[in-house]
Structure formats: C-alpha cells, structure tokens
Amino acid sequence: QPPGGSKVILF
C-alpha cells in the first residue's frame, strides 16, 4: 500500500 493509505499523491 502507498504511504497515504489507499491513495497515491504526487503533488
């Protein structure tokens, strides 16, 4: 899992 939970934040 990405370091935001289930979201991928690029900015």
Curated annotation (Swiss-Prot):
It comes from the Eukaryota. GO terms for molecular function: growth factor activity; receptor ligand activity. The keyword Cell cycle applies. The modification Pyrrolidone carboxylic acid is found at residue 1. Keywords: Cell cycle, Cell division, Growth factor, Mitosis, Pyrrolidone carboxylic acid. One of its GO terms (biological process) is positive regulation of neural precursor cell proliferation. The keyword Cell inner membrane does not apply. GO terms for cellular component: cytoplasm. Stimulates the proliferation of neural cells. May interact with SORL1 (via N-terminal ectodomain); this interaction is impaired in the presence of SORL1 propeptide. This is Morphogenetic neuropeptide. It comes from Homo sapiens.
